[in-house]
Amino acid sequence: MPRFKTYRKLLEQIHGPSSQLTPVDQVQFYAKMQDIYSCFYVVIQTLEITLRNKIHQAKIKHYNNENWYENFKAEPHCTFNAKRIINAALDKVDKDFKSKSINYESQDVLARITFGLWPEILKATYREKLFWQIYGSEVFPNKGKVKLSQIDDNLLKIGKLRNRLYHYEPLWKTTKNFKNFNELRSVVDEYFEIIMTLIKHCSLEKYELMKQMKQPEQFKTKMDDLFLFLSKTP
């Protein structure tokens, strides 16, 4: 089990090599890490849906077209990757609705567009265009003085994180080494904070909802629980 070996390696890194680490310790550590990962699902899904809907509404206004992705795809600054993502969504919706004998709507296409399109729309070549000058404050009404380039960088990070999460892979690069628990916590904490900040940039309402649902508290509690487990492991 290659993935389990990754967690065993991590446990040895942050705990220190010990002949007293048992298979039970390793399984419990793996389970606690998965429990921590579960905290990311709600916030990532909230970010994805909120950002998707914000861009969708702004693009409809910009092109005066519900099927704005067709206009965007035809623009010279639309990247190859953006076209690939849009075409994949269109192919999928065609396939899904082919046997239903009903027409699909823009929302059906939108639901099949993957997270990777949103950083593409924030690429430097596109940030210079009129869209972000007019609609930037509608998509990210609470970003303050944060630059779109920084938001783009963070979306790219979270996109990679999302892919690892949904493929049951470690949230960090497997080549990364940690000297102790604090280093691991710093990395995982940063990911969670980035997601919460991006949600806040898009919608204060959704940000407050995450707090009301105690998502940050649950995450902190599970990280504290992992620390307690490690401190008790021989």
Where are the predicted features?
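Extended intrinsically disordered or low-complexity regions, especially N/C-terminal cytosolic tails and loops
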Residues: 1-153, 157, 172-234
